[in-house]
Swiss-Prot record:
This is Tetraacyldisaccharide 4'-kinase. The keyword ATP-binding applies. It comes from Shewanella frigidimarina (strain NCIMB 400). NCBIfam families: lpxK. Its EC number is 2.7.1.130. Transmembrane segments: none annotated. Keywords: ATP-binding, Kinase, Lipid A biosynthesis, Lipid biosynthesis, Lipid metabolism, Nucleotide-binding, Transferase.
């Protein structure tokens, strides 16, 4: 099914015509919902601290999680105390849940587990992002909130919007779900503050982002170790764009004898992964690693990646954030 969807969205498969009526329904529902917020029939919850939303207008992976981690580190370097909220895709969260560094991906979602394991940032997940944000403000000392995804979650007021675009796949066939990958039309990009292009080449004022690989880490203990690149590996990925990962490790010189794709956010079966690593080491993404750390074997590895953006983006974001923070601080003091 996943391969068929990819062919429809990105390779011109004619089955898209069968799905276009459903895309029309999707457009109508999305349009009415947005109108309700635009004309005040529904109110977005405005928070007392700046809110940065990191999302995209397409379904599937585009580099949001590395971008969120980059923002956490950038804000900390400039004296901010960021916190993060997320929906926790792939899991059923009862109410809101604070994510701890040892949280299981099966309880809070793979991206939240990865983000907190990497950064120890205060983070709350929940189906209702407004409730998650309010809990974050109540229970933690934060002065800026980053929403991991949620560009289309208009109930949450936001001050800065960052949209990610996959620089290789772009917008596919330019159709709305389910005939294409779009959650909203391309017009939506005109209203965001920054469009970040993951993998380039950048177009129309987009900010170019590169994902730089770090040394491999062992899945079972999360520690960097020296991997013998003469050893063959089975590469697996359960992410939005697994081919990007497979291409990356091949370009890095790893001897890939087999690639295995899983659905995004899919829970892994211990025996299934063990069978893949009987004769070869198993190499996966960091997001996949957090889902199988409890039963990982000694020849399972993951490839960490770090987002790299230019200083012009850093300056523009920090400048805009400072203005928002000053305005909200003034309002809280009745100025």
């Amino acid at each position: 099914m996943q391969q068929l969807i990819h062919r429809i969205w990105y390779q011109g498969h004619q089955a898209k015509w069968l799905l276009l009526p459903l895309s029309g329904i999707f457009w109508f529902i999305s349009y009415i919902r947005r109108l309700l917020f635009s004309f005040g029939f529904k109110q977005a919850q405005v928070l007392p601290v700046p809110v940065i939303v990191v999302g995209n207008i397409t379904a599937g992976g585009s580099g949001k999680t590395p971008t969120v981690i980059y923002l956490i580190e950038l804000l900390r370097q400039h004296g901010y105390k960021p916190g993060v909220i997320s929906r926790g895709y792939g899991v059923n969260v009862d109410g809101v849940v604070a994510v701890t560094p040892n949280a299981k991906a099966s309880d809070v979602g793979d991206e939240p587990a990865m983000i907190v394991a990497r950064t120890q940032v205060p983070m709350v997940v929940g189906a209702k992002r407004v409730s998650a944000a309010q809990t974050l403000l109540t229970d933690f000392d934060v002065d800026v909130i980053i929403s991991d995804d949620g560009l289309q979650h208009y109930a949450l007021g936001r001050d800065i919007e960052i949209a990610l675009v996959d620089g290789e796949r772009r917008y596919g066939n330019h159709c709305l779900l389910p005939a294409g990958p779009l959650r909203e039309g391309l017009w939506r990009l005109n209203s965001v503050d920054f469009v970040i292009n993951n993998g380039g080449p950048a177009q129309n004022g987009e900010v170019l982002m590169a994902l730089e690989p770090a040394p491999l880490c062992l899945v079972d203990n999360n520690l960097q170790d020296k991997f013998n690149q003469q050893n063959s590996v089975v590469a697996m990925a359960g992410i939005g764009n697994p081919q990007r990962f497979f291409n990356s490790i091949s370009q890095l010189g790893y001897k890939v004898v087999k690639t295995v794709e899983f659905a995004d956010h899919q829970a892994f079966d211990q025996k299934q992964l063990s069978d893949l690593s009987v004769q070869h080491s198993l190499l996966m993404t960091e997001k996949d690693a957090v889902k199988c750390r409890d039963f990982a074997q000694s020849n399972w590895w993951y490839l960490p990646v770090n987002a790299k953006l230019n200083s012009e983006f850093d300056h523009a974001l920090l400048s805009q954030l400072q203005q928002v923070a000053q305005t909200k601080k003034g309002l809280s003091h009745g100025i």
